[in-house]
Amino acid sequence: YVGLVSGTCFAEMGVHVTCVDVNREKIENLQNGRIPIYEPGLDEMVMRNFREGRLSFTTHLTSVLNDVDIVFCAVGTPPDEDGSADLRYVLAVAKQFGENIQKYTLLVTKSTVPIGTAQKVKAVIQAELDKRCVNVPFDVASNPEFLKEGAAIKDFMSPDRVVVGVESKRAKELMGKLYRPFLLNNFRVIFTDIPSAEMIKYAANSMLATRISFMNDIANLCELVGADVNMVRKGIGSDSRIGSKFLYPGCGYGGSCFPKDVKALIKTAEKHGYEMKVLNAVESVNEKQKSVLFNKLFKHYKGALQGKKIAVWGLAFKPETDDMREATSLVTIDRLLREGCKVRVYDPVAMEECRRRMGGGVEYAADMYDTVLEVDALLIQTEWKQFRLPNWSLLLKLMNNPVIIDGRNIYDAEELQHLGFDYYCIGR
């Protein structure tokens, strides 16, 4: 994901880029114009730059290594069994890099990696050079990505900032040259030492996750004391010291970044003898929040869920992506199935991903209205634009019981209650 978006956007800025992956099928698909991920605008940009010769794809790093100045490492760093980042793929790239470089080359880590990874990468590369009995100069750098799935191209082409961790003048000059088009557009390129760059990525995602869990905690308290979390959100978000972003309560965060990065930062601290008490609480709140829709449904039906037909709108962890990694919908659906519910689901783009993950355990609807046919409740998991203004009269006709549980607070409670729905949301 990160590698394809980054490589394509660099090509769009005039850089000649070769994307490398060990998966031959993926490379062949890209060469034939089949994009393996859903990201708005990416397919057109890939094909344009491929057609114009600035973007190519291969399975062989060795075939291009001596023709490039910079190698970006954007492989996955999945959580290990204990929650820490698994660096096997990053270190495998470093090993191959050390085995094959013939001239000065800069290896830049784009993957989200724990603080101290650059030193491990350097050690692996140097060990391979020593085996070859050669003295080829190289540098490593850290250039963490801050891409939001669903808005990744915009984020790359118009970033808030670009963070680059380096430890040599040569590496800084090379990265400065690469990002010069961004400097011309007055975007900030922040050069740091490498450990700081590695920390910035984890700290940024953990801060955003903290805001989400804090607002979910506030929302849950609002329900108990009779306050409206949307009014609270507007009131505190108007404070310039706080701002309004990432203050929306809901049914928890998911995706490939926040859960993994929060856990990895906690584990990094533990390895250094420190406890991240705030982040432990953030993680705990989020795990509980993932069950909030199920809990509201359970309470509405007083626990009698066996045989109930339940519709779910939204499967991806957020709109404008088909990514279901750590999606809250998975928790909700699992709880529903274990209670004996019959579950029918719909998502504008994540249906195939859901089939891959869940198989025949749920029923797959043809569209958003097919989802609610004769159901006993509708659960909103993802705030896709398509779901914002449904035909309420049609929903009333199609549903057995007009119960809506809105996990993203996208509807007006008074309007739906006036129409005859039993409507539940977060924090009101």
Predicted regions and their residues:
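Structural/interface elements that position substrates and couple domains in central-metabolism enzymes
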Residues: 1-428
